[in-house]
Amino acid sequence: MSIEKNNNIGYITQVIGPVIDAVFSSGVLPKIYNALEVEGKDGPIICEVQQLLGDNRVRAISMSATDGLQRGVKVYDTKAPISVPVGKTTLGRIFNVLGQPIDNLGDTPSNETLPIHRSAPAFTDLETRPAIFETGIKVVDLLAPYRRGGKIGLFGGAGVGKTVLIMELINNIAKAHGGVSVFGGVGERTREGNDLYMEMKESGVINEKNLLESKVALVYGQMNEPPGARMRVGLTALTMAEYFRDINKQDVLLFIDNIFRFVQAGSEVSALLGRMPSAVGYQPTLGTEMGALQERITSTNQGSITSIQAVYVPADDLTDPAPATTFAHLDATTVLSRGLAAKGIYPAVDPLDSTSTMLQPLIVGDEHYKTAQLVKETLQRYKELQDIIAILGIDELSEEDRLVVDRARKIERFLSQPFFVAEVFTGSPGKYVDLESTIKGFNMILGGELDDLPEQAFYLVGDINEAISKAKTFNN
């Protein structure tokens, strides 16, 4: 669009950090969420209209730095919300909040764009029957299964394997479901974004030789960017994911890292716009903003968007309004444990702390439910006995408790699994384990059929047959 021919032109009356006020003389004001274009010293600056102030004035939040802007500079109404490229050409590329490539690989040859502000799917278009989203990762599928079109919270500190788990999920959805993934980096460190990109290229998730064969599109709005960009980058990633779901009719994985930063950016913008703060200084519109994002993440008759959201919990306070509002939308939680990572058990998913609303007999079936409950009971009993073992030794336990400990240690090791994306580091070929094989394997351990096998045979294997074969090599 040639904005020079656009007759809806205003000028800046005030600049306060990333917020600009503009007055439009024509009386035809830009609509809320319209993108405004301002000529900055390093090229055009895009702002988004947030408030209509009266007297032909609007207040907008900038998506990039406002350095060098002055009163009286012309402002052009683009007469449309921020729109971003969508489709297969986004795969293997990195974009900013405006959908502009930032990986120095040139423009995307996409003619299709969509506005980032869209309505959630109509109720009649939703797929309401709960279905499990099989990941091929034993610990997830058995103990905290993901819902197709659901929202999963990913909890874990630094260095416990979040990135590797995310990359394995991206790999598995592409291979097993023919789906694609979109990664939204919201307000996290630029270094982490760069590391993730490099690791994705190493593991083959991004195919450098043929970008269209890549399995993921990346959208970054990092913590050095203005709050407007961090607040909207999640919507940019979601819009790209919606296209794959609605037009390409694919299953999509949407990663948001970190959903707390989305709330934090909204809080900054709210204060800059002069709104009265709510509890703990958060924006009064916290629930509305979170709902507008989360309600668009769902299964429809066409396809699904399953979202995995890293959740930072400020000061480990789960009652803080930001994580508390997020929990209301989650169907499952995957908690990564530093203790398991220290033992070398990867993925370091905590089997007792991770939860899922899908783990009900009516949804997963009686066999799956009973197996999962027995696994949790065995691991919980082992956890209770660990203090006694540490003080008195395992010989002081009853015969029954010794058997529980023996099986729990096998279960703990069998919950580990070699990943495809970690082949480069471990040298072990990755394994995708279907749900039926997972349930069968744990039932055999719980039933005592494998009591004579050494526990190290269960470490970093795929299905139970591999563990049995591995045990034979120890005997030889």
Swiss-Prot record:
Known catalytic reactions: ATP + H2O + 4 H(+)(in) = ADP + phosphate + 5 H(+)(out)
InterPro entries for the chain: AAA+_ATPase, ATP-synt_VA_C, ATP_synth_F1_bsu, ATPase_a/bsu_AS, ATPase_alpha/beta_chains, ATPase_F1/V1/A1_a/bsu_N, ATPase_F1/V1/A1_a/bsu_N_sf, ATPase_F1/V1/A1_a/bsu_nucl-bd
Binding of ATP, residues: G156, G157, A158, G159, V160, G161, K162, T163
Keyword ATP-binding tagged: yes
Pfam families according to UniProt: ATP-synt_ab, ATP-synt_ab_N, ATP-synt_VA_C
PROSITE patterns reported for this sequence: ATPASE_ALPHA_BETA
First-listed, main subcellular location of the protein, grouped into a coarse class: plastid
Cellular localisation: Plastid, Chloroplast thylakoid membrane
GO MF term set: ATP binding; ATP hydrolysis activity; proton-transporting ATP synthase activity, rotational mechanism
One GO-annotated biological process of the protein: proton motive force-driven mitochondrial ATP synthesis
Protein keywords: ATP synthesis, ATP-binding, CF(1), Chloroplast, Hydrogen ion transport, Ion transport, Membrane, Nucleotide-binding, Plastid, Thylakoid, Translocase, Transport
Entry's EC annotation: 7.1.2.2
GO cellular component, one term: mitochondrion
Membrane topology field: Peripheral membrane protein
Assembly with partners or alone: F-type ATPases have 2 components, CF(1) - the catalytic core - and CF(0) - the membrane proton channel. CF(1) has five subunits: alpha(3), beta(3), gamma(1), delta(1), epsilon(1). CF(0) has four main subunits: a(1), b(1), b'(1) and c(9-12).
Family: Belongs to the ATPase alpha/beta chains family.
Known role: Produces ATP from ADP in the presence of a proton gradient across the membrane. The catalytic sites are hosted primarily by the beta subunits.
PANTHER family: ATP SYNTHASE (PTHR15184), ATP SYNTHASE SUBUNIT BETA, MITOCHONDRIAL (PTHR15184:SF71)
Annotated protein name in UniProt: ATP synthase subunit beta, chloroplastic
Organism: Fucus vesiculosus
